[in-house]
UniProtKB/Swiss-Prot annotation:
Homodimer. This is 1-aminocyclopropane-1-carboxylate synthase. It comes from Glycine max (Soybean). SUPFAM superfamilies: PLP-dependent transferases. It holds the Pfam family Aminotran_1_2. Its cofactor is pyridoxal 5'-phosphate.
Length: 484
């Protein structure tokens, strides 16, 4: 009982009590608002609709049907019990051979079989979160940095920085060219890091992009490859949305550039891919993360580090059987793309009816929604004010662009694949009602002439000042409490 009189934080490490996890962000506050008042069509029809979670529930029925028709794939059924002891016993860090083989084949299939993957280069980890952290531990030391094009997934601040002690240096991208990554932006970020005496060890790209829902074209990927080879830094390509592409242009993996574009000089030892089944197959709870490295030393070291976050053998066993079912996988990927395209069409079409535009996209589980016309002023404070209204009054959890480190106020990521058709229609109706109530402040085809000035002011600030940190110009978002 005496311990209760002591400040509990004094007994803990500085790392765990600090703010490095990144929870002090609107991205996570929106989740808390939903958790406190979740929408339910019957039990809580006025609750908050969760559109801040990039989860793929559009094909869950296909997986459920496969499991029902293949009970022997699970060691927890009468049909599969004979393999229980062999699978439940301790396995080495390499994982089940049949699982690694199945994942390698699936990765090739989601890339149109234009490239093959070596099962012996696959390292497992606890989801893409674990895969990113293990990769970072292998490639960089505390104080080193990775370049990351903005906007980027807020979880990278946790996954790459929190326990590794590295820095993330933003590569500026903006709406003037639909947020496309350029060679000049890469050079500017690299030189800025050098001026600040920060050693850059790598470049992290997300392809397809979260939050943009776009894919990188071949020329951009060639530029990236040339850049990292010239600077002698690592490239980590996050490709966890590779099978969510539902229309042209097609997804091009960095592996294809490495294998096919032989006119580009590049050291294969610098190239690494992070993959997962969470988005493509809708298995976030299975925590299947994959590191695929062309560097033998990284494969060896990552395998040792993966001992802290392995994928259970029961999960490996089930998924090996599923991914080796060629007929199922083929039909699943086709139907998944069809359903994602339909949901994207319905949602963006519904927004367009009230004059809301989104960045043109063809991948992912979300859209990058443009609400700049609804801002009172072209400032980050106005974006936060609008976001709070959307949470509190519209009762929808969307993620503001600032939480993705976007420097242009007014962009929001909206997820549409984690709900049924009815919830989508209710969400669209709420958005329409809100826009119609505020139509007088919307200016059609408004030119955002403030954009260049904002960029200039942000460039003069320290990097930490445009992050969600105690020094951020974005006010620390209080825990949002949505009310009925």
């Amino acid at each position: 009982m005496g311990l209760m009189d002591v400040d509990q934080t004094q007994l803990l490490s500085k790392m765990v009590i600090g703010d490095g996890h990144g929870e002090a962000s609107p991205y996570f506050d929106g989740w808390k608002a939903y958790d406190e008042n979740p929408f339910h069509p019957k039990e809580n029809p006025n609750g908050v609709i969760q559109m801040g979670l990039a989860e793929n529930q559009l094909t869950s029925d296909l997986v459920e049907d496969w499991i029902l028709n293949n009970p022997e794939a699970s060691i927890c059924t009468p049909e599969g019990i004979n393999d229980f002891r062999a699978i439940a016993n301790f396995q080495d860090y390499h994982g089940l051979p049949e699982f690694r083989n199945a994942v390698a084949k699936f990765m090739g299939r989601t890339r149109g079989n234009r490239v093959t993957f070596d099962p012996d280069r696959i390292v497992m980890s606890g989801g893409a979160t674990g895969a990113h952290e293990v990769t970072t531990f292998c490639l960089a030391d505390p104080g080193d940095a990775f370049l990351v094009p903005i906007p980027y997934y807020p979880g990278f601040d946790r996954d790459l920085r929190w326990r590794t002690g590295i820095k993330l240096v933003p590569v500026m991208c903006d709406s003037s060219n639909n947020f496309k990554l350029t060679k000049q932006a890469l050079e500017d970020a690299y030189e800025k890091a050098k001026e600040d005496n920060i050693r850059v060890k790598g470049l992290l790209i997300t392809n397809p992009s979260n939050p943009l829902g776009t894919v990188m074209d071949r020329n951009t990927l060639r530029t990236v490859m040339s850049f990292i080879n010239e600077k002698r830094i690592h490239l980590v390509s996050d490709e966890i949305y590779s099978a969510t592409v539902f229309s042209h242009p097609s997804f091009i993996s960095i592996a294809e550039i490495l294998e096919e574009d032989t006119d580009i000089e590049c050291d294969r030892n610098l190239v690494h891919i992070v993959y997962s089944l969470s988005k493509d197959m809708g298995f976030p709870g299975f925590r299947v993360g994959i590191i695929y490295s062309y560097n033998d030393a990284v494969v060896h070291c990552a395998r040792k580090m993966s001992s802290f976050g392995l994928v259970s053998t029961q999960t490996q066993y089930l998924l090996a059987s599923m991914l080796n079912d060629d007929e199922f996988v083929e039909s699943f990927l086709v139907e998944s793309a069809k359903r994602l395209a339909q949901r994207h069409r319905v949602f963006t079409g519904g927004l367009a009816k009230v004059g809301i535009k989104c960045l043109q996209s063809n991948a992912g589980l979300f859209v990058w929604m443009d609400l700049r016309q609804l801002l009172k002023k072209p400032t980050l404070d106005s974006e936060m004010e609008l976001w709070r209204v959307i949470i509190d009054e519209v009762k929808i959890n969307v993620s503001p662009g600032s939480s993705f480190h976007c420097t242009e106020p007014g962009w929001f990521r909206v997820c549409y694949a984690n709900m049924d058709d009815m919830a989508v229609q209710i969400a669209l109706q709420r958005i329409r009602n809100f826009v119609l109530q505020n139509k007088e402040i919307m200016v059609p085809n408004k030119k955002h002439c403030w954009h260049s000035n904002l960029r200039l002011s942000l460039k003069t600030r320290r990097f930490d000042d445009i992050m969600m940190s105690p020094h951020s110009p974005i006010p620390q978002s209080p825990l949002v409490k949505a009310t009925i």
